Amino acid sequence: MIKFDDKQLNNIVEQDGDKHFFIETWGCQMNEEDSEKLSGMLKSQGYEETENRDEASIVIFNTCCVRENAENKVFGNLGRLKNQKEKNPNLIIALCGCMMQQKGMADEILSRFPYVDIIFGTHNAYKFPEYLHRVQVEGVQVKEIFDKETEIVEGVPIDRKSNVKAFVTIMYGCNNFCTYCVVPYVRGRERSRRPEDIENEIKELVSSGYKEITLLGQNVNSYGKGLEEEITFAQLLRRINEIDGLERLRFMTSHPKDLTLDVVYAIRDCDKLCEQIHLPVQSGSNEILQKMNRHYNKEQYLELAKKIREEIPDVTFSTDIIVGFPGETEEDFEETINLVKEVRYDAAFTFIYSRRNHTPADKMENQIPDDVKHDRFNRLVAAVNEGIVVGNKAAEGKIYEVLVEGTSKNNENKLTGRTRNAKLVNFDGCKEMIGKLVKVKIIEAKSFSLVGEVVE
């Protein structure tokens, strides 16, 4: 563990005039939390965040490389920044995140977009104030990518985007090497934070009024490996459940091969652990699962889901599914559809397979044509949505405890929040309810949300 050196914050040069920054984030919740830390470091030095990129004196793109589409968005946005840089030569453009960690990517960026000022990767984001200082004082272009993961850095300032719920990372990296995935290459090997550091962060959040914590990790079930103190993920959950003032606890992501029954029992037994599990299946075909290097088969996954439902009757499942993986036949795809119907997910992140350089799947034979991928994707989404509608319909007439998160995105006159099992609910109420737990009766089920009314 390394303690963040806050002295480097003192090196950020006071700029004349506007001190606004803009951060655009692509990718997962881990990236979102990384952006909150970048924002925290800048706000510690008097910078203000703006939602208007044209107003910013610092623009940061926190990138993702899980799919080609995310990379193309970065290239497109960089191209549009050229005019802004020409109008304001003092504009500082910084790129970070998983895309930058890929071999040769930083050099490609600087070749195509020479007006970029700072490039850094996933392992050294805590050094951003140092890089910014060098650009401001020395007028140099900074590119620094660490090939290997560093020790975990504690104490980095963080600017939370919500006053009600927060992400807390418990581990970094992944050791699984699924054949389609770049995460182990760009996020490094698994490293776990010390349990006392996690507990202290959560206690500080609770004392500041936060009600819900989501524990993050590429594979939270691997938590504890390599720590001096012997501790499992289930034991960590039970320890956090004892923190006074915490109302709700969630976690993601779980790998089906590593989700043990002691974690299931912890969810069953602990009053603060929410009845919701994100359990990526990726495919319902055993042949495809083997090609993906997932280390479980369809039967094992279904048995695990069945056991979870037996122990936690109100549980909801969400998942990740990829269609169009190399060699996927129509029969393989139909097995995925059948699994989706059997499990009946309450939410799903569905993806068309995207070839990624330097992954084994990219070199596999029988790559699927795009038109076939898109056809299967549309059929998958339809099957998933059918299950979601059934689950939402079953909620009608029931009363749920809802944590009020804020006003609805679609209607500022309505409040929005989630049930313990992660159902999104919109309802009428006063803004004083934000941050509180309220009882809501569901009066209407919509396709992807519920409509309710507050009950006394």
Swiss-Prot record:
Signal peptide location: none
Residues the record lists as binding [4Fe-4S] cluster 2: 174, 178, 181
Domain Radical SAM core: 160-392
SMART domains reported in the protein's UniProt record: Elp3 (SM00729)
Catalytic activity from the UniProt record: N(6)-dimethylallyladenosine(37) in tRNA + (sulfur carrier)-SH + AH2 + 2 S-adenosyl-L-methionine = 2-methylsulfanyl-N(6)-dimethylallyladenosine(37) in tRNA + (sulfur carrier)-H + 5'-deoxyadenosine + L-methionine + A + S-adenosyl-L-homocysteine + 2 H(+)
Domain MTTase N-terminal: from-to ranges: 19-137
Localisation: Cytoplasm
Main location: cytoplasm
Family: Belongs to the methylthiotransferase family. MiaB subfamily.
HAMAP family on file: tRNA_metthiotr_MiaB
Record-given protein name: tRNA-2-methylthio-N(6)-dimethylallyladenosine synthase
